[in-house]
């Protein structure tokens, strides 16, 4: 099997393992929800716990058409998959980092000029939830690939229904806006249809 196919198979295996870990996390939350009123001290605590766990269960729902991760960072011989939510294995070790996590910021901000200790930034291509391709940028060597075809394909993908999730396509300038302090006023300018509201949302 060629090296590219071997690497793609390994990433698909990680995706499958991450989906299984997410399923276990949801089952655990459902078990807690089922027994929550038995361990709560009073009716108010039981109701609060129930609402919190119901939100958690909804947050842990898996959509097989949506990839769990869209990128990977290789930093000091460690691989960190970056996605839309945090997923852990049974020992609590991260399998997928939430895109909002501090370490994930490097996925958006690192460059060949300022690699931020990132050796490789990998972007994944998906079709209906199936991992089909990847592109690597060797930032630690000072190599930047330029415009990513995977990124362009994601940006140009037809939009259907409500505003689409944009976390896989955030650019460095947008990332700075998304992570700005809440008490900071920001003005975003641009032509209609260019995604101006996205950082605010």
Feature locations, PLM:
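Exposed loop/turn and edge beta-strand positions of beta-sandwich/beta-sheet ligand-binding modules
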Residues: 182
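Hydrophobic anchor at the beta1->P-loop junction of P-loop NTPases
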Residues: 188
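Motif I (Walker A/P-loop) of helicase-class P-loop NTPases
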Residues: 196-201
């Amino acid at each position: 099997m060629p090296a590219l196919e071997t690497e793609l198979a390994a990433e698909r295996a990680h995706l499958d393992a991450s989906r299984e870990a997410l399923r276990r996390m949801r089952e655990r939350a459902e078990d807690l929800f089922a027994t929550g009123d038995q361990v709560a001290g009073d009716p108010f605590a039981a109701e609060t716990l129930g609402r919190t766990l119901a939100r958690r269960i909804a947050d842990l729902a898996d959509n097989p058409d949506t990839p769990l991760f869209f990128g990977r960072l290789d930093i000091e011989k460690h691989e960190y998959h970056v996605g839309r939510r945090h997923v852990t294995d049974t020992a609590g070790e991260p399998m997928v980092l939430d895109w909002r996590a501090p370490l994930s910021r490097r996925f958006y901000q690192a460059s060949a000029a300022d690699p931020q200790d990132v050796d490789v930034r990998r972007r994944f291509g998906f079709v209906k939830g199936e991992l089909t391709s990847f592109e690597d940028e060797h930032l630690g060597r000072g190599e930047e690939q330029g415009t990513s075809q995977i990124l362009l394909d994601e940006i140009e993908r037809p939009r259907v229904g409500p505003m689409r999730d944009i976390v896989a396509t955030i650019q460095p300038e947008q990332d700075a806006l998304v992570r700005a302090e809440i008490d900071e006023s920001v003005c975003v300018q641009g032509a209609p249809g260019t995604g101006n509201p996205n950082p605010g949302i």
